[in-house]
Every structure is written in structure tokens, then in C-alpha cells.
Amino acid sequence: MDEQVIFTTNTSGTIASVHSFEQINLRQCSTQSRNSCVQVGNKYLFIAQAQKALINVYNLSGSFKRESVEQRLPLPEILKCLEVVENNGVQYDRIQGVNHNLPDFNLPYLLLGSTESGKLYIWELNSGILLNVKPMAHYQSITKIKPILNGKYIITSGNDSRVIIWQTVDLVSASNDDPKPLCILHDHTLPVTDFQVSSSQGKFLSCTDTKLFTVSQDATIRCYDLSLIGSKKKQKANENDVSIGKTPVLLATFTTPYSIKSIVLDPADRACYIGTAEGCFSLNLFYKLKGNAIVNLLQSAGVNTVQKGRVFSLVQRNSLTGGENEDLDALYAMGQLVCENVLNSNVSCLEISMDGTLLLIGDTEGKVSIAEIYSKQIIRTIQTLTTSQDSVGEVTNLLTNPYRLERGNLLLEGESKGKQASNNNGHNFMKIPNLQRVIFDGKNKGHLHDIWYQIGEPEAETDPNLALPLNDFNAYLEQVKTQESIFSHIGKVSSNVKVIDNKIDATSSLDSNAAKDEEITELKTNIEALTHAYKELRDMHEKLYEEHQQMLDKQ
């Protein structure tokens, strides 16, 4: 198992390995906006091209991997951000009572893209249908799109200093021509550059401890508790106010001396790392005070308690007058937190490794530095292999994901063991459907459309006679009833009872037991004799060794 890093600059794209020196360049790759690159599973890479209404598709898996463009998808207009929504995290499908593995050609459910004017496009990838277009999702350009909770909600941020949370079902519903957001966060005063969501997620926002971290050019980090968002309430005809449920609670605000460009969270939500023009800094969310005291900076006050988020000011450790011996308790009482400087560079993008030990830092010079978080040392620097220009521009996209080492392939995921879909020329004939330009009319029930979907290989261990609730619910209930009756008749005590039919069997069993006792006594006698003989041999050996040692001393 290894990790690969994918990063793009203004004029190039590169795929490299974190722990080895394997590296390739992507051809005809040009991006100028952040978050314009998205990985579709372990197979495809979508990159929205700069100054072109086009998405370049690169194949990254198996024997079909190519450095050149695999497919081009025309767009209605130039897109700035891309994101995909997976199929609710389903690992396999159950079809006709048989479990099927993930197929080789496995596409996500939705593809989302945004424009410079704040317009939001939603496509269904398996058919290419344009489900909906939100003309004014943001007043200005959208900077990032991210789905959470297996695609139930979608979060967007923009240059209009707003962060908006949408319900996916509202965006794709045919009956909802103008979808409304679930809630809007407008605490920032300048464009929101990046945001991250904590790893503690569940099926619903109300029963999770999901936290949202947003950063902006106003030099602030804001943390919200998303678990208090309720369902939307319909507006009544005679009421002027519209209630959309409880808004997220602002837990804390962190101010910095510099404008923030990027943020990344530790996989265990222990710390956050921010990138600025003056360097990369780390902040422990479980802040250690003097001695053994530890403070949770994001402690929530509860559902029924009105809490006003605290405001903290971040201070570099090397800028303190007292150095390492500075009184952390006094600084914390004044609302100041000491943060560590990881790297001094003009940071544009940040990512973290799967185990949280390595930090990947993309700068404005087109380089990606891999730094060890504990020692704050640069382990490796990755650059574009070949270029004829003096500068390739800043790093616009930075992605990391784990991959398998298979058949000596040290860079991209090896060819799967199942059947490969290929033609005589050795190219993959499974193509992604073209993205439509006209919104699909879902109200027309007689209008049919095609969906491109491949079914994976069936699992060998699956019992074909197994009844599933989606296929035959009555048979499934009968099967559960049978299993329950079997368990109800089984007692808690398991014992073996020997039944003696007559006296002859009893006498023979007694004779066999007596013979076994005699054999055991004889074996014990033999063991005692062998032990006594071994002791005599050991004494003789010790005496001979002493005599031999005395003879050597005389010589």
C-alpha cells in the first residue's frame, strides 16, 4: 500500500508517489483555478481546462493508463470548480439475490461544476443528463464544492464571502425549479478561500458531531457545529418570516496576522494546518497548557444552550519574547494561542497523508514539498519533470489517495483480475457519456433515456438460495422466522450423557479403566527410573570435568 499525489499548475499536471520516486506528467493539462481537478474513483481524473469549455479525462488505472487525454467532454461554458457525488457509499449491488463486486467501469452519481458568475451545474454521470442549473448559487465565483454524509448534503463557498449548505435531493428534484439552501453562513467579510469538514460523520447531521472549518482572506478561521441543523420548514402564506431550522453554531473564531489561502485537518481531528503567503502553520485543537492540562478549543455548550463562539488570536512561537518558557496559561487567558511554523513559503494548497504524519504543501512556484509534521523537516520536493518555461505557475490542485502495489506497478493501480473491457487495439471502449447542455425535463414521464452502467463480477461465496428483502420480502421473513425458531430451541447448557444399557457394558468399562490405571502407574515408575539415571550421569560428568580441568592447570 502506498499513496500517490496528483497536482496541477497553470501549465502542467503531475502524478507522483509519496514514498517512491515514480513520476509521470499529464499532457495537454492547463488549469488556472483551484479545485478544478477531481478524481473519479481509482480510474479517471477530470480536469477543467483553463479558458476552455472543456473537461479533459485521464485514465489512471490498469493496462489502459495513459499520460495523454483519454476523452474530452464539451461543456456549456467554462467551469472553475469540479466535484463528484458518489453512489451513497455503496460497495456492491445485490442483483437477483447475488452480491456483485464493484465493476471496472464505475462512475459516481453526480458531477457538479461552477462558473465564474456563481452558476452551479448538476449532471448525472451515468447518463450525461443535465439535471439542474442553479443560476445564482453564489453572487460571485464559487471557490469550492464538497459533498458530505455520503452525498446527502453539498457545501459550497464563494468569493461573495458566503458558505452555503444544500440538500442534494433539492438540487436534483424535478419538481423543484428553484432549490433553496438549507442554511447560509455569512460571518466572513472577504472571499472564502477554503473549507474542511471533520472526519466524524454519520448518516444524519442531527446525530453526528460534524464540524465545519472555513478560512477566508479576512485572516480568520471559523469553526461551526453542523449537528444542530434541522429540516426546513415551509413558509406559511400569512407569515413574513421563513424558518429553515436551526443554523450552525459558531464554536470558535481564530484570527491570524495573514490572509489564509488553504486549510487541511488531521485525519483524527486533532489539529488543523493553514497555508498563508508567509508560510504554513499548525494549530492543535486539543491545546496543551502549562503542566498536564489540555483544553478542547471546540467544546460545544449543548443543544439547548445559546453559545457565543470564543475569539482566539494565533501567535507564532518564535515571535514570543519569553521563548519556550512563555506562560501558556496567561496567554490563553488573554485569548492568545501559540502555533507552530511548519514551513516558510508562499503556500497555495495543502493536503495531508492518510496516517496524518506527512503534510503536502503546494507553493506558488509550482513545487510540492512533503514535510514530516513531527520534526518539521522537508523529506522530498516534487516538481514538474520537463518544461520549457521559466515558471509553471502556482499549484492549483493537490490530491492524495492510497493505492495498491500490484504486479510491480509502483505508480498507478494495477490491472484488476477480472475481465478487462478492451478492443483489439488495446484501448478502453467504455466511454463516459457526453454532458448535455439542455436541462432534462423530468416532468415528461414518457421521455426515456439511457444509463451507462456496468455490473461487477458476482462473489463466489454468495449463496444463490439466500433470500434478500428487496427481492422477495415474504421469503425473507420466512427465512428469519426459521432461524429464530432454531435458536429458541437451543439451550444454554451443552452436555454429553452416556447411557449404559446393561451390566455387561458397565463391567467392561470398569475393566478398561483399571487397565488404564495400571498402565499409568507403570509409566510413572519408568519416568522415575530414567530421572534417577540421568542424575547419576550428570554427577559423573561433573566429576570428569573437574579432573580434566585440574590436569590442564598442572600443565
Swiss-Prot record:
GO terms for biological process: DNA-templated DNA replication; rRNA processing. Keywords: Nucleus, Phosphoprotein, Repeat, Ribosome biogenesis, rRNA processing, WD repeat. PROSITE patterns: WD_REPEATS_2, WD_REPEATS_REGION. SUPFAM superfamilies: WD40 repeat-like. Component of the RIX1 complex, composed of IPI1, RIX1/IPI2 and IPI3 in a 1:2:2 stoichiometry. The complex interacts (via RIX1) with MDN1 (via its hexameric AAA ATPase ring) and the pre-60S ribosome particles. GO terms for cellular component: nuclear pre-replicative complex; rixosome complex. WD repeats lie at residues 90-133, 137-176, 187-234, 342-383. This is Pre-rRNA-processing protein IPI3. It comes from Saccharomyces cerevisiae (strain YJM789) (Baker's yeast). It is found in: Nucleus. The modification Phosphoserine is found at S388.
